[in-house]
Amino acid sequence: KSNELLAHAYSKLYGIPCTGLRFFTVYGPCGRPDMAYFGFTNKMVKGEKIQLFNYGDMYRDFTYIDDIVKGVSAVMEKAPDANEDGVRVKVYNIGNHQPVSLKFFVETLEKCLRKAGVIDNEAEKEFLPMQPGDVYQTYADVSELEKDFGFKPDTPLEVGLTAFAEWYAGYYRRK
């Protein structure tokens, strides 16, 4: 939030047009190893237990990396128009706008990893209560992105996770 306020101040003071982007739970090939889906994958490969909080009933808006790239490309085509205060600042959410439960996500990931030959075992899951401070649901409202640029992310979860699983299989077989 502070970066959005700073962008607003710079735009107002110096006339610099600023566009902010909020990414929602990005996943895909070559992803960050500290993200949950990567951690789940590594645990499945090692046969370790996966912990699912709120008994797997937490919802996240998982967004495939190609959709993020397309969204960034679309937004780069045009600086924001001035708002009612004359400030040229706009913030867009880039997310799949279809949150799924963590339980469903892990089950789909497991299926894709099995199909790609990464695992052949059943993932062991531990269902735990909600952690203090955790958020039950996050999702992206992409209506402004769609209105201004005619774009909204649309990669189905299974398609994106299949691409990740195939990449993971190829990358880690070489190591």
Kindly label every feature range from the protein language model.
Residues 42-175:
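C-terminal substrate-binding subdomain of Rossmann-fold SDR/epimerase-dehydratase oxidoreductases
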Residues 9, 31, 37, 69-70:
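Hydrophobic alpha-helical membrane-insertion segments
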Residues 16-36, 58-59:
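Flexible, glycine-rich beta-alpha linker
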Residues 1-4, 31-38, 62, 99:
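Short-chain dehydrogenase/reductase
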Residues 1-19, 41, 45-46:
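Active-site Tyr-X1-5-Lys
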